[in-house]
Amino acid sequence: TYGGYVTVKFDHPVQNKRGSDLRIKGNGFYSSGDPKYGKETIGGSFEPGIVYVGVGDDVNTCKWYELAGSEYYTDEIHDFSITYHKPVAEEGEHSQMFSSFDNYIKWEASWTDKNGERRDSTGYHMKISFHRQSFWPLWEEGETLTFKGGKLPNNAVNYGTEASQNWVLYRYAKDAYGYVDASLNTDDYSTFDIDWAVDEQGNHVDLEEINFVKVVNGTFQYCGWLGETSTEVTGFQDLHLVEGYDENPIIITPRTSTGLSVVKTDSKFAAKDDSYYDLMGRRVATPQKGIYIRNGKKIIFK
């Protein structure tokens, strides 16, 4: 589910050279029976994960940067936070289809929506009857787990009924890039360019090399009998070690950035001598809650 991650370190720094630098494999595949798009489908089983790269000698102290994928500047939520509570039992009351415990793992989430409004939600992950093992990490001694970061849009559609479900999990577009387990392993779109690195404000960062790679499950959605959507990771590869690759590297042209950086602040801290504009380009004398532009940056007043 959202926030689960795997972190790896190569036995050498991965250089940032021309073109894609990494290939990260998942187990995505296309549907052979998409009831809506048929053979033209870009759907199947794709469970996108966000990639972060770390610079430093120690995984606990290194500086992390997100690789901005195709949805970063449009539909990604950048401040999603969720807390999961350790289940009190492995079986319990259940009335939902495919469930062996309806109120299995409690969760509480919060985020800022596109209008700058703070949202929150709470609920439970049910335990799928097909999976008897505990969903909770057995090595975790605490009562809660909290994850924070980017969250990608949901990508699953059920074309069946509640009793006979037919889930298709789509790529965001034919040229969507920047996410693990979101294309075939043989596609160019399963490769990643360190040049896509951005800091916490969404500003481009020039990195000569990276030491760590982290893949984080980027969606928060439940798909009936399939359960929660979870990124699958099956391998990492430094492309520059492939013979002849640097002579003809994979080039993925990133989506055009909005040129805006995100700064979250309270409206009472609005600078009186600065000009603020709404998203229609109109000057605003006194910003209230919402999203504004100041000096080329996106300002979210809460």
Predicted regions and their residues:
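Beta-strand signatures of extracellular beta-sandwich domains
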Residues: I50-Y52, S275
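Short loop/turn segments immediately following beta-strands, especially the blade-tip
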Residues: V55-V59
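Tryptophan-centered short beta-strand motifs
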Residues: N60-L67
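C-terminal tail/sorting-segment detector
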Residues: I291-K302
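A domain-level signal for the mature, folded cores of soluble proteins
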Residues: T1-E47, G69-T256
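Surface-exposed, flexible coil segments in extracellular/virion-facing regions
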Residues: V284-Q288
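Residue-level detector of functionally pivotal "anchor" positions at catalytic/ligand-binding pockets or at interdomain
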Residues: P254-M280
